Amino acid sequence: MSSDSANRDLAPLIALMETEALQRGEFTLASGKKANYYLDCRRVTLHPKGACLIGRAMLDVVLANAKESGVMPAAVGGMAIGADPITASIVTLAGGDDVDLKGFMVRKEPKGHGMGQQVEGPVTPGQKVVIVEDVITSGGSALKAVEAVQAFGLEVQYVLAIIDRLAGGAEAFAQKGLELKTLTTIRDFGLEP
């Protein structure tokens, strides 16, 4: 896993996440694991300031990676519904910056009518994409998105998340040959795995 927060001032995002998204108590996570805190990132991804902060930070990571690798992804997207506001924020800011970066979404199941697609958006097989996600625990949700877009014929460059709980997600992606890039980790909030 690489945390891409080193050269970026993420203090405003971290502060907003602490006040809006971080809850303490006993919780069962999507992975089935128990935790003494919960990060409801939708409270930040759907917040006007949060959407801007996340969209800008993630777009910066995508552009920096494209500059370093020489390969610009065609699109960003992830599993509905958690990744949808993240995708929208990134592509909106990309459009404002005149960057040709589209978005897509992955349905949990293929649509039962119409074209019956699981991957929706202006993408075509063979294109390179980045999977975006809010919180990574085991990586299960993002891995389902990876599998769906690969089945559609897209090539995943890496996974980009807001926060890594440091609970095995990076290792799960590495087993699939993918790198996990994150804006923050739980340690940025004074928490340990």
UniProtKB/Swiss-Prot annotation:
GO biological process: 'de novo' UMP biosynthetic process; pyrimidine nucleobase biosynthetic process; UMP biosynthetic process
UniProt-annotated binding residues for orotate: 137, 165
GO terms assigned for molecular function: magnesium ion binding; orotate phosphoribosyltransferase activity
Gene3D superfamilies: 3.40.50.2020
Catalysed reactions, semicolon-separated: orotidine 5'-phosphate + diphosphate = orotate + 5-phospho-alpha-D-ribose 1-diphosphate
Protein family membership: Belongs to the purine/pyrimidine phosphoribosyltransferase family. PyrE subfamily.
Record's function text: Catalyzes the transfer of a ribosyl phosphate group from 5-phosphoribose 1-diphosphate to orotate, leading to the formation of orotidine monophosphate (OMP).
Summary of subunit composition and partner proteins: Homodimer.
HAMAP family: PyrE (MF_01208)
Protein's UniProt name: Orotate phosphoribosyltransferase
Classification of source organism: Bacteria, Pseudomonadati, Planctomycetota, Planctomycetia, Pirellulales
